[in-house]
A protein has these predicted regions:
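Contiguous, often N-terminal, cationic amphipathic patches that form binding interfaces
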Residues: 1-51, 56, 74-78, 85-105
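Short acidic capping loops at alpha-helix termini that bridge into adjacent secondary structure
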Residues: 70-72
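Generic structural marker for isolated residues within well-ordered, non-membrane alpha-helices
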Residues: 59
Length: 105
């Protein structure tokens, strides 16, 4: 089942992430619903949140997990916030299926 955390948009998907920087390890902790009902993918990275290091680590980690080039992922919003929206280029059906598997859905 598709999650509101990832939505298809033509030739890409939008992924909502709640990032925990300095999280001890790089990991996907599943999909979680916020108090307002919006869902997001919980991701932690070991990088520190300074000078964009955590954002770069997030993009590199997700690219590796999805088997994509890092250039296929971009940050749309949330550069300095925990909640981020990413654009991931590729076949939306395939990307959503892979993300659901990674999130344990």
């Amino acid at each position: 089942m598709a999650s509101k955390a990832f939505t298809a948009h033509g030739d890409h998907i939008r992924l909502t992430v709640r990032l925990t920087p300095n999280g001890g390890r790089d990991a996907i902790d599943g999909v979680e619903a916020a108090a307002d009902g919006d869902e997001h993918l919980k991701v932690r990275v070991s990088a520190v949140p300074e000078k964009g290091k955590a954002n770069q680590a997030l993009l590199a980690f997700l690219a590796k997990k999805l088997g994509l080039a890092k250039s296929k992922l971009s940050l749309i919003s949330g550069e300095t916030q925990r909640k981020k929206i990413l654009r991931i280029e590729g076949d939306p059906e395939d990307l959503i299926r892979r993300l659901a598997e990674l999130a344990g859905r």
